[in-house]
């Protein structure tokens, strides 16, 4: 690969081999004027540019010699009228005007009518050759047709926000020294701050440029997209030009005028999306020309602080701080912090005292080179918690729901807010409140004291609101697109929990996905395989109605692969597919006689009950299996008229995969459980099962944890039976669904896909749920569906699927090392649900939900294990975190007023030199201390 990084190597190369285009390599001698111009506007100190440098190849194909001639005579940031330029260039007005218009259209120059220098009292139009960054780099990348025709300008932009800064960033003082951009906080976050000054507020700048605003394309989003590192945001209209710059972007067809209210609406939408406000920072305290709404995954300006680990390049005068007592470790601030300054930790004291959390090293007293940089900042900033861990409930939940958060809101009687918080990760809380396997409760720290908090029952109470059209919660859409929704069509194949979760989060993001379901109604296994006495179908319908309200289309009775193919859907305009067809059928009972007429898959049995109303059973029923499906099958058999029901499983009684609740429900209904037995043979009479022989199971797994049951063949138990219902595995039925695609399969029949993105070998096809993981629970499928939505959004927008992606990895705090002062917590015993005896052994749910009084008592039992922790050394004071917290637990404080000192770029050394001298003194003192300590 040709060195495209200049004469000096950098540790952060632009990988040319990964680009979708070739960096130009001219076959002619370099043009000296372009070399001079490129060097002049970028000012890379100590570089003698060659044709291999970005300063040359970034301009060579766009800028003519005639343009370069004029630009070189203009000088950098020295405004001139056309009359002055006529004198300098010796050109006639008409050809010069035409050339200047072409240069402005291209983005090489700008113009304005201001008189800040006192040399333009009549406010004549003056032309300026700007710096490359911020300046012509943005202008060159603010027109999609230009980037498409000359993609090297995107690479030029990326290089010039890196190479000129490699050596200087550690020496930049607070305030940024007139270099690049400057973070300006969310205004609402500082509205009560008495010492806030005008230039720290968006409204101040908008009023300063009253009536002159224009929205325009984000050059960072557009250029990064061209480099194959897009973030999925729509690139249009995120950047707001103000003052004369608004006229420039409109007149050169880079933007359109907007009103004050429209500008404020864009800023609010940016905050909703977690974007950072930044103002230009090269003109001192009296002028800016743009306010950007920046996504850290693509922003070249934020990169200057994040990649070099030098926050002074960006930070505002404010620092976030958490009020620990209010914090509930919901993680919203963590997920949205652009700088990775907030992570989840714990409130609970340890036996060794309270945890002291580390702070990031800063360049103030340390020599700073590439070894100190944070090259992978976009991924590292998405680390969710400290190694010491956080709340076990959030960690254990596959969807990582903010359990501690919604318990707190419920305790305060804020049920709607609690429902909103749950649905950020789980669109089916009413469903899960009835069927979840409650891993959060298994992990609950309270369980080490007495009993776990009844988390799921509280969730069920909260989610009752979703069952009423008047009180259900329909989320506001948070769309990373300024004007309207996304138009790309996405198909969800399979209307189960994974598919519907994917559809929900795509709709929330601004899509109108279509769910294709082969059955007559959506819901998948929720509707057709979970008995209604556990999950009444009006509950599922109510939560599906929320999807309809969001704009999700359901096409039921359509089997993709049979009624319509993926190829045909592509012809209809579908750009992406999420395949979540589940495991629709049971496997075989692989023992002699296992194919007898009355040996039936438990899943097929339940589906027959729900889809075809097949409810007649006679005689003795034997259920084989120990999971939650086996419990459902056994209890359904009771309701279908079985004379008796017995359940046999390999595992010991305490190790049965079904939960304690399922086991007790079975026993309440007279189902006999025989734990530790495996099927040996089905004995038949006239082709039908009459008896089934079981042998004693001594162990289920080997030392490595692999399924390898060991039996005592001499210990046999016979079970007479009229019907055998086996629940020992499920399988996907693909048929012709994926015919003609490149999707590959695992030996067990599940689809192969990337474990992070769920993308298959066919790029536009993603998979999720049981069809990918094998048999799991509804909450696992729901979590996978949200990740599928994230991938599909990124994919159809042409973005990277992985960079800056939250991997949703959490660590459980060490409960054994937690110091819990039992006397300081509520000692009320765990609340219990009631039962409606009139509904016992019917197909209605006999469980009675908690009352409000029980919810209040139960939520008081939460120990409040987790909390967010801010590293002030990393915080850039953007205030995004404050917009996400529903508990007012994180606020901005004006602790760094020096960060609001703004310089003109021409005066940057006036700021840098004093700071550099002080820093060098600190470094030498630190080195002397280190040497002394070493002795």
Predicted regions and their residues:
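Glycine-rich dinucleotide-binding loop and its adjacent helix/turn
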Residues: 462-484, 509, 542-562, 586-640, ...
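A short, conserved structural fragment
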Residues: 104-117, 342-343, 890
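FAD-site-proximal beta/loop scaffold in flavoenzymes
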Residues: 595-618, 702-775, 790
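Flanking helices and flexible, charged tails adjoining ferredoxin-like Fe-S electron-transfer domains
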Residues: 339-392, 407, 453-455, 459-489, ...
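Short, amphipathic alpha-helical interaction segments positioned at domain boundaries
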Residues: 119-162
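A conserved FAD-binding loop/helix module that cradles the flavin
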Residues: 633, 771-796
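Beta1-alpha1 glycine-rich phosphate/pyrophosphate-binding loop at the start
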Residues: 401-404, 410-411, 452-456, 492-560, ...
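Ferredoxin-like iron-sulfur electron-transfer modules
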Residues: 61, 91, 127, 278-291, ...
């Amino acid at each position: 690969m040709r060195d495209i990084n200049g004469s000096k190597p950098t540790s952060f190369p632009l990988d040319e081999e990964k680009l979708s285009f070739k960096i130009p390599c001219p076959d002619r001698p370099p043009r000296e004027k372009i070399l001079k111009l490129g060097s002049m506007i970028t000012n890379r100190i100590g570089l003698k540019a060659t044709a291999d440098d970005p300063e040359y190849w970034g301009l060579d194909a766009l800028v003519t010699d005639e343009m370069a001639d004029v630009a070189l005579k203009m000088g950098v940031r020295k405004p001139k009228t056309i009359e002055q330029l006529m004198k300098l260039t010796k050109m006639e007005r008409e050809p010069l005007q035409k050339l200047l218009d072409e240069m402005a259209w291209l983005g090489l120059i700008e113009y304005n009518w201001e008189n800040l220098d006192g040399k333009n009292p009549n406010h004549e139009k003056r032309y300026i050759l700007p710096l490359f960054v911020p300046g012509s780099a943005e202008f060159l990348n603010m027109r999609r047709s230009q980037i498409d025709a000359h993609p090297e300008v995107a690479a030029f932009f990326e290089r010039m926000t890196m190479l000129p800064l490699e050596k200087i960033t550690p020496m930049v003082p607070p305030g940024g020294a007139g270099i690049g951009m400057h973070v300006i906080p969310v205004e609402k976050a500082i509205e009560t701050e008495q010492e806030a000054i005008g230039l720290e507020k968006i409204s101040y700048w908008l009023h300063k440029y009253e009536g002159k605003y224009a929205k325009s394309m984000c050059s960072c989003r557009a250029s990064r997209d061209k480099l194959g590192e897009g973030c999925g945001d729509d690139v249009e209209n995120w950047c707001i030009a103000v003052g004369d710059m608004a006229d420039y972007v409109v007149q050169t067809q880079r933007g359109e005028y907007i009103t004050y209210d429209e500008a404020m609406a864009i800023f609010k939408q940016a905050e909703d999306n977690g974007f950072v406000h930044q103002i230009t920072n090269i003109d001192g305290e009296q002028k800016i020309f743009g306010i950007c709404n920046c996504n850290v995954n693509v922003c070249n300006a934020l990169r200057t602080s994040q990649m070099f680990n030098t926050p002074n390049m960006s930070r505002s005068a404010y620092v976030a701080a958490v009020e620990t007592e209010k914090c509930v470790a919901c993680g919203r601030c963590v997920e949205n912090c652009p700088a990775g300054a907030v992570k989840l930790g714990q409130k609970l004291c340890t036996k060794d005292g309270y945890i002291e959390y580390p702070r990031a090293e800063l360049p103030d007293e340390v020599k700073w080179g590439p070894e100190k940089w944070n090259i992978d900042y976009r991924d590292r900033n998405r680390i969710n918690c400290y190694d010491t861990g956080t709340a076990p409930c959030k960690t254990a939940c596959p969807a990582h729901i903010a359990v501690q958060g919604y318990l707190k809101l419920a305790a305060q009687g804020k049920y709607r807010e609690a429902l909103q918080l749950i649905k950020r990760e789980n669109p089916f809380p009413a469903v899960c409140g009835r069927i979840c396997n409650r891993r959060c409760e298994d992990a609950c720290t309270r369980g080490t004291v007495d009993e776990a908090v009844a988390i799921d029952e509280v969730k069920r109470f909260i989610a009752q609101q979703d069952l009423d059209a008047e009180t259900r919660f329909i989320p506001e859409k948070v769309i990373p697109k300024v004007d309207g929704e996304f138009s790309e069509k996405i198909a969800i194949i399979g209307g189960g929990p994974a598919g519907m979760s994917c559809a929900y989060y795509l709709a929330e993001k601004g899509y109108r996905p279509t769910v294709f379901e082969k059955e007559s109604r959506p819901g998948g296994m929720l509707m057709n395989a979970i008995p209604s006495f556990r999950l009444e179908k009006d509950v599922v319908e109510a939560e599906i109605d929320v999807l309809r309200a969001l704009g999700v289309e359901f096409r039921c009775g359509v089997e993709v692969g049979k009624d319509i193919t993926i190829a045909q859907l592509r012809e209809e305009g579908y750009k992406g597919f999420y395949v979540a067809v589940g495991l629709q059928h049971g496997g075989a009972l692989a023992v002699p006689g296992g194919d007898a007429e009355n040996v039936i898959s438990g899943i097929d049995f339940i589906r027959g009950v729900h889809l075809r109303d097949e409810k007649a059973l006679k005689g003795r029923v034997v259920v084989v299996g120990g999971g939650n499906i086996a419990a459902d099958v056994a209890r359904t058999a009771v309701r279908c008229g079985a004379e008796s029901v017995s359940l046999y499983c390999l595992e010991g009684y305490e190790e049965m995969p079904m939960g304690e609740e399922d086991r007790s429900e079975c026993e309440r209904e007279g189902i006999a459980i025989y734990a530790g037995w495996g099927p040996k043979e089905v004995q038949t009479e006239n082709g039908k099962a009459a008896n089934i022989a079981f042998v004693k199971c001594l162990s289920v797994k080997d030392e490595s944890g692999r399924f390898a049951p060991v039996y005592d063949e001499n210990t046999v138990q016979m079970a007479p039976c009229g019907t055998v219902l086996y629940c020992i595995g499920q399988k996907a039925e693909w048929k012709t669904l994926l015919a003609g695609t490149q999707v590959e399969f695992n030996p067990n029949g599940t689809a192969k896909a990337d474990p992070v993105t769920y993308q298959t070998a066919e790029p536009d096809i993603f998979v999720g749920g049981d069809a990918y993981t094998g048999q799991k629970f509804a909450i696992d499928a729901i979590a996978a569906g949200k990740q599928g939505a994230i991938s599909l959004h990124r994919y159809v927008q042409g973005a990277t699927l992985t960079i800056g992606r939250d991997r949703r990895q959490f660590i459980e705090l060490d409960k054994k090392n937690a110091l819990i002062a039992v006397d300081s917590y509520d000692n009320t015993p765990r609340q219990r649900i009631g039962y409606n005896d009139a509904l016992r052994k019917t197909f209605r749910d006999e469980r009675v939900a908690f009352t409000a009084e029980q919810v209040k008592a139960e939520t008081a039992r939460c120990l409040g294990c987790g909390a967010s922790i801010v590293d002030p050394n990393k915080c850039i004071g953007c205030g995004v975190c404050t917009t996400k917290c529903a508990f007012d637990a994180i606020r901005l404080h004006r602790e760094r007023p020096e960060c609001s000192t703004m310089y003109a770029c021409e005066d940057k050394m006036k700021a840098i030199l004093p700071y550099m001298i002080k820093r060098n003194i600190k470094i030498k003192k630190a080195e002397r201390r280190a040497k002394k300590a070493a002795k």
